[in-house]
């Protein structure tokens, strides 16, 4: 075996050996590999990393005696407690937020008209938009726009509706997949690593 470049590489190898023994899980993953190229492209478009951005009201200012907090082990918590799309995405015809059912993940392409952020922290990246017209940006993030066309997951779509005002929106394409928990052996693996991490945290040597 090759020496892993990082510690995470070692953990991935260990998990891979466990999941490869689960034939039921392998069949489920194989079934998802039949995804249409058009849907795959939408999934790539919808992908977004974490939010790291300055509040533009305070950019370039130095503050003293500030405080912060850290949510420890947030990623393992999400992996263990949240559900994920576990089937292939199929076309549907939803038109609004209220059409979305809690047991399904959604992938949509949506147009927003006269959209404006409610807060000084702006969340939509103009670079992720298929179309962006007549707007104002905060270092690449959209403060407001006459029209944008963007591909989103149901989670990001609901987040945008909660953090932006808009005159109206139009869902032009939509797909759904069933939400399910990750396999038990995966969850148990994460929990085992979490226990080990907390048990040996701060131990000398």
Predicted regions and their residues:
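Conserved acidic
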Residues: 1-205
């Amino acid at each position: 075996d090759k020496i892993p470049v990082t510690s995470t590489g070692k953990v991935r190898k260990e998990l891979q050996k466990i999941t490869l023994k689960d034939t039921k899980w392998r069949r489920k993953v194989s079934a998802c590999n039949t995804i249409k190229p058009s849907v795959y492209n939408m999934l790539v478009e919808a992908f977004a990393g974490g939010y790291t951005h300055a509040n533009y009201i305070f950019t370039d200012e130095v503050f003293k005696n500030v405080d912060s907090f850290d949510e420890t082990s947030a990623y393992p918590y999400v992996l263990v407690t949240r559900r994920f799309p576990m089937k292939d995405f199929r076309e549907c015809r939803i038109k609004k937020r209220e059409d979305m059912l809690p047991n399904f993940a959604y992938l949509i392409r949506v147009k927003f008209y006269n959209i404006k952020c409610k807060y000084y922290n702006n969340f939509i990246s103009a670079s992720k938009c298929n179309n962006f017209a007549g707007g104002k940006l905060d270092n690449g993030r959209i403060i407001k726009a006459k029209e944008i066309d963007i591909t989103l997951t149901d989670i990001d779509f609901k987040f945008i509706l909660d953090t932006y005002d808009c005159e109206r929106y139009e869902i032009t394409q939509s797909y759904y997949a069933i939400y399910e928990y990750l396999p038990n052996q995966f969850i148990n693996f994460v929990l085992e690593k979490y226990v080990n991490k907390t048990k040996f945290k701060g131990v000398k040597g």
